[in-house]
């Protein structure tokens, strides 16, 4: 646990969750280029939390898996009640060009 967040790294995957074990009651997926998984997950988690912080009981989870052409990100988390439109909000956040550009720039590999 790092700063109240659980991190799990495995071959080809990375998971960041507030509660363990992670659970997706709501989620959306998106594809990303190959970048540093931990940095990408933390940036998405921050903006996901900002977008959904008004949802009582929401606990974010970000899961990133290696794919042939980059990464597959699953963003969402625990939500004790069914709230219409939440998955759409998450999907729109993951597809927002301004957010994506910032996340990718922050998570790109840096030369030493």
What are the roles of these predicted feature ranges?
Residues 1-6, 38, 42-46, 89-102:
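N-proximal, solvent-exposed amphipathic alpha-helical segments enriched in charged/polar residues
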Residues 12, 56-58, 69-73:
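Residues at beta-strand starts and edge strands
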Residues 13, 29, 63, 74-78:
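Residue-level recognition of well-ordered beta-strand positions that form the cores
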Residues 19-24, 61-72:
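Short, charge-patterned binding micro-sites
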Residues 27-37:
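Short histidine-centered catalytic/ligand-binding loop motif
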Residues 36-61:
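Short, internal acidic amphipathic alpha-helical interface segments
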Residues 67-112:
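Helix-rich interaction surfaces within compact, conserved domain-sized segments
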């Amino acid at each position: 646990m790092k700063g109240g967040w659980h991190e799990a790294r495995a071959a080809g995957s990375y998971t960041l969750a507030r509660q363990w074990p992670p659970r997706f009651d709501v989620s959306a997926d998106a594809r990303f280029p190959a970048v540093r998984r931990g940095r990408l997950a933390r940036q998405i988690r921050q903006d996901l939390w900002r977008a959904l912080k008004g949802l009582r009981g929401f606990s974010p989870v970000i899961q990133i898996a290696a794919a042939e052409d980059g990464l597959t990100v699953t963003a969402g988390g625990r939500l004790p009640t069914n709230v219409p439109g939440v998955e759409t909000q998450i999907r729109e956040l993951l597809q927002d060009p301004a957010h994506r550009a910032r996340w990718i720039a922050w998570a790109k590999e840096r030369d030493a």
